[in-house]
Amino acid sequence: MSVVDRISAWARKKSPWLIHFNTGACNACDIEVLATLTPHYDVERFGIQLKGSPRHADVLVCSGPITMQQKERLKTIYDQMPEPKFVVAVGTCACSGGVFNGCYCVEGGIDASIPVDMYVPGCPAKPEAIIDGMVKLLKVFDKDKKKSEGRSQNGKRSE
C-alpha cells in the first residue's frame, strides 16, 4: 500500500462524509438524521460531515423503504460513490420496509436494492441511536483499512 493510499485510508477512517437520501420515508427519520447533524449533538467531533454529492461521500445514509420510483436513483447514487463505500439504513422502514412493507409500490428495506453495512432501527430512529450506529461504523472503517492493507493488488493476501 502506497503512502498516499495509507493517508487516504487514515483520513477516511477519521472523517467519514455522508450523503443522505430519502427513498420514500414519511420524513420522521429525515428530521432525526438532520437533527443528528446539528450543533446540539456535534457529530463533527467524530469528523462526520454531510456532503451534497455522492462522489464526495463515504457513507450513504438512507431513510424509508425502497419504492419502485426511487430504486434506480438509489442504485445510481450508490454507484457514484467511491470505494470503500458504506450504507446505513436509518429507521424501521429502511431496515425492513416497516409499515409500508407489502404495499404495491414498496419493494422492502434498503437491502432489497443495495448492500447495507449498518442498521439503525426505530420509528423514528433517535439521534442517539444514529450516532451510536455511526460510531460502530467507524470501527468497520478501521477493519476495512486493516483488511485492505493485508491484501495485494489482485485481491489475494500478501505474504
Indicate residue ranges for each PLM-predicted region:
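Iron-sulfur-associated redox domains of electron-transfer enzymes in respiratory
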Residues: 1-149, 157-159
